[in-house]
């Protein structure tokens, strides 16, 4: 099954995490790169951006207290609104309403997630609906939403005790055409970031 981009949130022990995976048919030559407290998805060939403006973006941004994950530039808006005092649910909802779905041929949904404390928020903006849900996380929980097929908020079997292991676990989910993945994992002093690029 091809599900496109995947946003995941979860909890391992006392640590919450977010994860992101690129699965792609059209632009598989992409990588995830960590820089500071953010992870960026970008094409190997920068000129590919001229063919599709949606293929490069910050997929994860983290502060000491929360982490945001999404499949587009709305990562920044969600992060900034939470920094300015909005709750995660409101920040995700407002940002998805503001951005809407991607204006490409497939009308690709925008998806997003936030973890803060022991709570998570997942959201999706499709061409015909916008949905946002708050989830209270328990140890071992993992939830996902994807751009195609798996567009509901559903539990997924994943585990890991670090950003690196979460990124690899997400990459290994049994969905077609994985390209790269990334994760942010809560530590005592903030969020640890990791990326997985198999080639």
Curated annotation (Swiss-Prot):
Enzyme Commission number(s) from the entry: 3.5.4.10
Major enzyme class: hydrolase
InterPro entries, per database record: IMP_cyclohydrolase, IMP_cyclohydrolase-like, IMP_cyclohydrolase-like_sf
Annotated keywords: Hydrolase, Purine biosynthesis
Pathways involved: Purine metabolism; IMP biosynthesis via de novo pathway; IMP from 5-formamido-1-(5-phospho-D-ribosyl)imidazole-4-carboxamide: step 1/1
GO biological process entries: 'de novo' IMP biosynthetic process
Pfam family, one: IMP_cyclohyd
GO molecular function terms listed in the Swiss-Prot or TrEMBL record: IMP cyclohydrolase activity
Alphabetical list of SUPFAM superfamilies matching this protein: Archaeal IMP cyclohydrolase PurO
Keyword Membrane carried by entry: no
Highest taxon in the source lineage: Archaea
Protein's UniProt keywords contain Hydrolase: yes
Reactions catalysed, as given in the entry: IMP + H2O = 5-formamido-1-(5-phospho-D-ribosyl)imidazole-4-carboxamide
Chain's role: Catalyzes the cyclization of 5-formylamidoimidazole-4-carboxamide ribonucleotide to IMP.
Family: Belongs to the archaeal IMP cyclohydrolase family.
Full protein name: IMP cyclohydrolase
